[in-house]
């Protein structure tokens, strides 16, 4: 494994050696800040955050060869089910300061952690404390989005995803 970053073309994530293995990283939008005690790595003056596949389904997909990665710099994203903010924080790194993520979370207890640990430090995240089943009540979404990312576990999650896609 080389010691330099390897940029996956148009994907905005990086592979670096760490602890003798090839690990996944994103460039930290908020240098010096961790979200879930992930390892930070600085290369050539740029800070990167280790994206743990055991804490993020999206990271696990990338580690297993995900071919269609829709998140790009400056994208507008609707993220359903942000939970405590692990995955959305890495997507925030990827879309950068000119992208926007509308992060929907229904559970007020989980949302409190997300707000305190992630959203307050990341200006490109707009938190929405609302039920993903009611997209007509997201008053903070002010534009059409490029991607709807669904990270919820509901029996009717397909209907929820389709309803959100139709609205935004």
Predicted features and spans:
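N-terminal auxiliary segments of SAM/dcSAM-dependent transferases
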Residues: 1-48
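Conserved class I S-adenosyl-L-methionine
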Residues: 71-85, 101-102
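S-adenosyl-L-methionine
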Residues: 102-145, 149, 153-157
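A short glycine-rich, Lys/Arg-flanked "PGG" loop and its adjoining helix->strand segment in the class I
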Residues: 92-96, 160-168
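Conserved alpha-helix/loop element of class I SAM-dependent methyltransferases that forms part
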Residues: 31, 35-38, 52-76
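Conserved SAM-binding loop of SAM-dependent methyltransferases across substrates and taxa
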Residues: 83-97
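Residue-level signature of catalytic and energy-coupling elements of molecular machines
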Residues: 62, 81, 148
């Amino acid at each position: 494994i080389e010691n330099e970053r390897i940029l996956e073309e148009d994907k905005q994530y990086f592979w670096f050696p760490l602890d003798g293995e090839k690990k996944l990283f994103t460039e930290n939008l908020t240098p010096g800040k961790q979200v879930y005690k992930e390892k930070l790595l600085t290369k050539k003056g740029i800070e990167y955050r280790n994206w743990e596949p055991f804490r993020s389904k999206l990271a696990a997909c990338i580690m297993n060869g995900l071919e269609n990665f829709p998140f790009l710099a400056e994208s507008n994203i609707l993220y359903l089910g942000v939970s405590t903010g692990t995955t959305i924080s890495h997507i925030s790194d990827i879309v950068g300061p000119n992208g926007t993520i509308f992060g929907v979370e229904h559970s007020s207890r989980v949302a409190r952690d997300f707000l305190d640990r992630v959203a307050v430090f990341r200006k490109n995240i707009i938190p929405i404390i609302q039920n993903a089943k009611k997209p007509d009540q997201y008053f903070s979404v002010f534009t059409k989005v490029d991607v709807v990312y669904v990270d919820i576990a509901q029996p009717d999650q397909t209907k929820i995803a389709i309803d959100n896609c139709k609205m935004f």
